[in-house]
From Swiss-Prot:
Organism encoding this protein: Bradyrhizobium sp. (strain BTAi1 / ATCC BAA-1182)
Active-site residues annotated for this sequence: D77
Cross-referenced Pfam families: Ham1p_like (PF01725)
Catalytic activity: XTP + H2O = XMP + diphosphate + H(+); dITP + H2O = dIMP + diphosphate + H(+); ITP + H2O = IMP + diphosphate + H(+)
Gene Ontology terms: biological process: nucleotide metabolic process; purine nucleoside triphosphate catabolic process
UniProt: Mg(2+) binding residues: D48, D77
Cofactor(s) required for function per UniProt: Mg(2+)
Protein name stated in the entry: dITP/XTP pyrophosphatase
Cofactor note: Binds 1 Mg(2+) ion per subunit.
InterPro entries, sorted: dITP/XTP_pyrophosphatase, ITPase-like_fam, RdgB/HAM1
Source species taxonomy: Bacteria, Pseudomonadati, Pseudomonadota, Alphaproteobacteria, Hyphomicrobiales
CDD domains given in the database record: HAM1
Family, as annotated: Belongs to the HAM1 NTPase family.
Key words, A-Z: Hydrolase, Magnesium, Metal-binding, Nucleotide metabolism, Nucleotide-binding
Function as written in the Swiss-Prot or TrEMBL entry: Pyrophosphatase that catalyzes the hydrolysis of nucleoside triphosphates to their monophosphate derivatives, with a high preference for the non-canonical purine nucleotides XTP (xanthosine triphosphate), dITP (deoxyinosine triphosphate) and ITP. Seems to function as a house-cleaning enzyme that removes non-canonical purine nucleotides from the nucleotide pool, thus preventing their incorporation into DNA/RNA and avoiding chromosomal lesions.
Length: 214
C-alpha cells in the first residue's frame, strides 16, 4: 500500500459476482455517496484466484476489474478458517461450495470432518472469518486492509439470514449465529458499534483511509 492514501469518489466497480457479498458491500458503501456498479452488470469476467492468501486474491480481483472497467474497483476475498481442520477451508471456502455455490453441502462437509476428528465440544470448534479488502485504481494504485472475527461452529446450522457459512458461525460473545442476525446486527455499524463481522471490521479500516462520509 502506498504511504500516500487516495480517496474514493464517483463511480466504482464492486468486483464480485456473489449476490450476497454484493448486497453487503453496497450496504456498507451506501453512506459514502459513491455509485457502486457490479462486475456482473459490466459483464466483466472473473479472474483466476491464484493467490496463496486472502489479501493476494482480493488484489487480483480488484486490479483485474479496475483494468477492465477503467474505474476504481473494490474487491473482497474472505473465508472461514477452522482451527481443528488446520485452517481449512480458508482461501478455498468458496470452492468447497462447488460450482453450484451449495454452502449447505460445504457446511455439512466441515461438520463431518470435525466429527471425524472428535471435535464435538465448543472448545474444539473454534474458527474465525477473515475478510481482505482491496481498492485498485486503473493506474495501479491500491489500498488494502484485512480483519477477522473469532467464534465457534454450531451444528445444526441456525438461521437463514446472511449467506455462505453464516448459519454455523457463532461470533464470540454472542448467542446467535450470523445466520440469525439482521444485516445491521451482523455488521455492527453505528449506532450499534464499530464492526462485528469480519467484512464490517475490514470496511471500517478501509473507510478511514479511502472514504468520506456524506
Amino acid at each position: 500500500m502506498s504511504s500516500s492514501h487516495r480517496k474514493l469518489s464517483g463511480r466504482i466497480v464492486i468486483a464480485t459476482h456473489n449476490p450476497g457479498k454484493l448486497a453487503e458491500m453496497r450496504e456498507l458503501l451506501a453512506p459514502y455517496g459513491v455509485e457502486a456498479v457490479s462486475a456482473g452488470e459490466l459483464s466483466l469476467g472473473e479472474p483466476d484466484e491464484t493467490g496463496e492468501t486472502f489479501q493476494a486474491n482480493a488484489r487480483i480481483k480488484a486490479v483485474a476489474a479496475a483494468d477492465a472497467a477503467q474505474l476504481p474497483a473494490f474487491a473482497d476475498d474472505s473465508g472461514i478458517v477452522v482451527h481443528a481442520l488446520d485452517g481449512a477451508p480458508g482461501i478455498y471456502s468458496a470452492r468447497w461450495a462447488g460450482p453450484d455455490k451449495d454452502f449447505t453441502a460445504a457446511m455439512t462437509r466441515i461438520e463431518r470432518l470435525l466429527q471425524e476428528r472428535g471435535a464435538t465440544g465448543p472448545d474444539k470448534r473454534g474458527a474465525h472469518f477473515v475478510s481482505a479488502l482491496c481498492v485498485a485504481w486503473p493506474d495501479g494504485h491500491v489500498e488494502e486492509v484485512e480483519a477477522r472475527v473469532d467464534g465457534t461452529l454450531v451444528w445444526p446450522p441456525r438461521g437463514s439470514a446472511g449467506f455462505g457459512y453464516d448459519p454455523m458461525f457463532l461470533p464470540e460473545g454472542h448467542d446467535r449465529t450470523f445466520g440469525e442476525m439482521t444485516s445491521l446486527e451482523k455488521h455492527g455499524l453505528p449506532p450499534l458499534g464499530l464492526g462485528l463481522s469480519h467484512r464490517a471490521r475490514a470496511f471500517v479500516k478501509l473507510a478511514e483511509i479511502c472514504l468520506d462520509q456524506r
